[in-house]
């Protein structure tokens, strides 16, 4: 596959929580120019804001009123950016399929990182749009084993590329001082890094917060009422923290947690934070998420309910050093650099 540029359509903001899209695309941008197209953003006037963020060009459609995702103006701006180059269309959401109109005949990659139709407030037409995208994509990359299993019936176009880790970045947690936000908190400190939304088990958090520990949730609260979250004095919500500061946060954790609910929104998740936690040499406790059990069940403590989760957190100090070391080595084996290289080789064979 010969391409001169990549056009990306994403439901996530490029300057949001640093995760799979940013990790992959900043690396792909070292090979060819990348345009990252976001969903519309309400503003006082209609225009397409185009700016460089690192080595990626970000197009944010600003609209004075509600507009369709990837509307005609966005498609026109994308077409102008492409110019006469050979483009690859790379989508994270089926709702952006119209971006393909900016480059008729261009190959399409669907990097499927979540079962978006199962999320709260998903557009009712999303499933139909995904059917169209699955039919048109030359390659379907799945960010986890469960997503792969649900789509492998489509044949050789479907590839498993579970999320990786920037190992050296997170391994710094072993050698640096804890973040100032954590230095005065009583131990043990159990921490979560990521979006706080409908995937979090609020009742489980309440059970955990009743124990003698500090609970720290690092990330934006979205799609849920913050008032429904535990409001105890030992529970702390920091909001989003810069990616550069995450190792210092992990340096202050006694245990890292994944307190996910068991619901439709979590049935197919493969949390990027798993190898990030492990690379930091922190004991990890998770609820019974299928992909975590399948890929990391031997190095992550898996809890079946709220009480066993809280018990595992409080017992984390007794985690055998061999288990922590094995988790570190597991994380070392799944670098983003290696994943991007394998993706590129796969596309060259298409």
Regions found by a protein language model. Give the residues of each.
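Conserved donor-binding/catalytic core segment of Leloir-type glycosyltransferases
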Residues: 182-199, 205-209, 215-218
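A charged, aromatic-enriched C-terminal amphipathic alpha-helix characteristic of glycosyltransferases
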Residues: 318-348
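Carbohydrate-associated surface elements
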Residues: 146, 161-173
């Amino acid at each position: 596959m010969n391409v001169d540029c990549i056009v990306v359509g994403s439901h996530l903001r490029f300057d949001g929580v640093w995760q799979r899209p940013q990790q992959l695309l900043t690396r792909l941008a070292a090979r060819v120019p990348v345009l990252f197209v976001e969903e519309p953003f309400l503003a006082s006037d209609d225009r397409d804001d185009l700016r460089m963020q690192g080595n990626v060009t970000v197009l944010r459609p600003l609209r004075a009123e509600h507009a369709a995702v990837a509307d005609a103006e966005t498609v026109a701006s994308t077409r102008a950016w492409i110019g006469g180059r050979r483009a690859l269309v790379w989508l994270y959401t089926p709702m952006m399929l119209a971006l393909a109109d900016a480059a008729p005949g261009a190959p399409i990659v669907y990097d499927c990182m979540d079962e978006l139709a199962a999320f709260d407030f998903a557009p009712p037409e999303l499933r139909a749009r995904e059917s169209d995208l699955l039919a048109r994509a030359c390659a379907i990359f799945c960010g986890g084993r469960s997503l792969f299993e649900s789509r492998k019936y489509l044949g050789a176009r479907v590839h498993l590329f579970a999320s990786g880790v920037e190992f050296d970045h997170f391994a710094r947690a072993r050698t640096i001082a804890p973040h100032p936000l954590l230095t005065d908190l009583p131990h043990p400190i159990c921490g979560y890094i990521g979006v706080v939304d409908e995937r979090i088990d609020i009742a489980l958090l309440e059970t955990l917060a009743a124990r003698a520990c500090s609970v720290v949730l690092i990330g934006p609260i979205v799609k849920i009422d913050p008032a429904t979250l535990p409001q105890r004095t030992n529970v702390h919500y920091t909001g989003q923290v810069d990616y550069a500061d995450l190792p210092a946060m992990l340096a202050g954790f006694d245990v890292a947690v994944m307190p996910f609910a068991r619901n439709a929104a979590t049935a197919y998740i493969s949390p990027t934070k798993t190898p990030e936690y492990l690379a930091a040499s922190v004991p990890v406790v998770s609820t019974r998420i299928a992909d975590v059990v399948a890929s990391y069940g031997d190095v992550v403590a898996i809890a079946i309910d709220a009480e066993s989760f809280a018990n595992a957190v409080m017992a984390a100090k007794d985690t055998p050093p061999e288990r922590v070391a094995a988790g570190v080595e597991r994380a070392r084996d799944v670098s983003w650099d290696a994943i991007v290289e394998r993706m590129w080789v796969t596309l060259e064979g298409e």
